């Protein structure tokens, strides 16, 4: 069965589209934080087609972890219905940052214009000074960009999907655009340590998120065949390879 999600670049700008409609293909575009300019031909979604059982078992993911190394950098490995990923709130050694918080009433984003928006016009930097008792308070309906504590690798014969952690645990949602392509974070392609970017939003009440708290799960799926191009290879322009706190490609970020 097919499965659709937002492109990472539109997700990291907090643009949400509903799925589930059967019939002629439409997209409901609902900006939550920034106003966006789209036009005929603008690319907001991506589609994966699956044949038969798609998700590999936890045992198979454990074997891949032992032979290939799917994630590293966390204190413990939690594989239950996918590989658990936790949030990193330790300040970056160079920038001192722990994340980004979207500004309200910011300008317009042209969805087809990469590197066209000044970061400071749209985002506030979060540092250790923003922590409360070692945690970060997520305010209702504000949008945050954080990073996983773990470094992630997707082997060439697999793809991965990041799924929200059990929504019964906590009133927040982490990561809306969940597709990871083969080659993501692969050292063989020259990638450095690559974290997963987490798009996080609290719902109705303030929510305290703490260092190392599990926020989502990464589920690996076998590819029908090895793709001709891998994420981050010399033929691609990959915005998130070797990433830390990486914003969408529309922003002028070093």
Language-model segment annotations:
Residues 17-22, 50-53:
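Extended, regular secondary-structure scaffolds
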Residues 10, 132-178:
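Compact, glycine-rich, soluble single-domain proteins
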Residues 1-12, 16:
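Single conserved hydrophobic/aromatic residue that forms the stacking wall/gate
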Residues 29-33, 90-91, 147-151, 165, ...:
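A structural micro-motif recognizing beta-strand termini
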């Amino acid at each position: 069965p097919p499965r659709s999600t937002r492109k990472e670049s539109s997700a990291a700008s907090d643009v949400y589209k509903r799925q589930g409609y059967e019939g002629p293909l439409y997209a409901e575009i609902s900006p939550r934080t920034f106003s966006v300019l789209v036009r005929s031909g603008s690319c907001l979604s991506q589609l994966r087609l699956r044949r038969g059982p798609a998700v590999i078992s936890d045992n198979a993911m454990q074997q891949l972890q032992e032979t290939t190394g799917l994630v590293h950098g966390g204190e413990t490995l939690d594989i239950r219905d996918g590989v658990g990923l936790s949030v990193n709130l330790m300040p970056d050694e160079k920038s001192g940052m722990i994340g980004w918080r979207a500004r309200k009433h910011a300008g317009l984003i042209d969805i087809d214009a990469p590197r066209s928006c000044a970061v400071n016009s749209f985002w506030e930097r979060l540092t250790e000074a923003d922590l409360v008792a070692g945690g970060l308070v997520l305010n209702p309906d504000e949008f945050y960009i954080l990073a996983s504590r773990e470094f992630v690798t997707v082997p060439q014969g697999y793809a991965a999907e990041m799924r929200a952690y059990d929504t019964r645990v906590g009133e927040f949602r982490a990561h809306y655009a969940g597709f990871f392509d083969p080659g993501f974070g692969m050292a063989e392609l020259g990638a450095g340590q690559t974290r997963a970017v987490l798009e996080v939003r609290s719902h109705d009440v303030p929510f305290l998120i703490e260092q190392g708290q599990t926020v989502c799960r990464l589920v690996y799926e076998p590819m029908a065949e090895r793709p001709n191009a891998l994420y981050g290879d010399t033929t691609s322009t990959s915005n998130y390879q070797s990433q830390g706190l990486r914003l969408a490609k529309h922003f002028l970020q070093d």
